[in-house]
């Protein structure tokens, strides 16, 4: 059977596997018919579920939809959702082929487009990022030279503009999301027309005329584009009409009741005038234009233009380098000076003046003690240690006379030098009198020291006096007496006896090893007026040539060393007769300080230790 079927030839049909059809039946079997009917119904159902695309109508055949765009452009509310492809430099300023090539170039770059919104107005074109709301492009309409849709891509639109900084031709390309490129190009054309109308209206209102010559190579312009009245033409027209009505109002309304009737006239007419003349101008003035987006707060802080701390700009800051690099003109220095002048009124009063002088005297004693501890002898402390009252009395008028009479100096050194110069001038006048008194006091001291014996505090000082055994004798009692009076306040006794020049007014003839800067300045001022013999002072630099005073030292502490045993028992009967010469000497010193006490506590008696020749 199979062989006969194979021999019968022909491919096997599907109906061969089916049971034989009844006699007289023709056509395909029933099952085949049902399958074909099911497939047809499914295709019909699938087609019914699909959304059919509307029939395409070209943009040129529906210009009625663009009329709303023109009004929106004039009002500044026209916008289109687009994808910003980017910008590329082009060689020509116009041409559809130039824009098409730019679109192809940007699409070939594969750069990701930015979903944004294109705002079209009479002012210009703005592209705002739809997600971050950043201003991507802000193009003035005057700089746009050409715009056109793409003939190859229905959604593409491009415009060519002049770059403001590099002066190159740049083409910006877009892909519209909902509209066509032709509609975007039409909106930009409306912006061109609105801008041109505004410019012509401005020229007409301002009265600007341009006269060209025959060759068209030059022109002369008359008038100005600047608005003399209000900032806007409509406001200026309304202001002119208000002025005219105000001028005509007094003539129309002579009585008091008339102004109330006339006054509503400008109020009622001006809004109408503004409404009539302002509706078309509103687009020109961009009253409803989109405000430009400002930088975020973080960017303002980063750029340094943040105004959250106004105190930094109000106060004078020393970090404002744009003011001046001179120290006297720095804001910090000026502020310090003004603060001193405000606070300086308190020391100028009489009661605080003494406290100020006491503070200065304490500072001076501290500085002098630091100099002495460092090994630089200070010649002047004994005159200061003769009594706190004697030192404070002359210093009070000096401080009170200095502060109100002068503006505050920038440094203490200038104040110091000024005081030293005053002292030097005073010393030149008082020098002759001091020399006479010094000679008399020298004779008195020599007589008293011959009669007097050593004082109990002296043995403690003896080890420091060994290098100066010969010259220290004449000044032992004086140093001891000072040490007895004021050792705790000024701490002078430990080092006063160690230097021969710390005694009394005969010091200009006695050499001293060290010198303070103030005395160097004082000596430089008064070196020309010094009448003392210079060789003695110049020899005193070495500190090993004090023998000129040795003959005047018959007794004192210089003799315990050579005589040995006989001298130690003598200090016991000495205290009783010691009081009378000491009191006499102290009285002589108290009568003297009014003449020789200067205002500068550092200078002391200002004896000349050596001369500086320049």
UniProtKB/Swiss-Prot annotation:
Q: Which Pfam families match?
A: NumbF (PF06311), PID (PF00640)
Gene3D superfamilies per UniProt:
Pleckstrin-homology domain (PH domain)/Phosphotyrosine-binding domain (PTB) (2.30.29.30)
Residue numbers of Phosphothreonine PTMs: 279
Domain PID residue range list: 74-223
**Alphabetical GO biological process terms:** adherens junction organization; axonogenesis; cytokine-mediated signaling pathway; forebrain development; lateral ventricle development; nervous system development; neuroblast division in subventricular zone; neuroblast proliferation
Q: Where is the composition biased (Low complexity)?
A: 246-260, 371-390
Keywords annotated in UniProt? Cytoplasm, Developmental protein, Neurogenesis, Phosphoprotein, Ubl conjugation pathway
Regions of biased composition (Basic and acidic residues) lie at: 233-245, 409-418
- What is the name attached to this protein's record? Numb-like protein
Top-level taxon: Eukaryota
A GO CC term attached to the entry? glutamatergic synapse
Domain commentary: The PTB domain is necessary for the inhibition of MAP3K7IP2-mediated activation of NF-kappa-B.
Work out whether the entry's keyword set contains Disulfide bond.
no
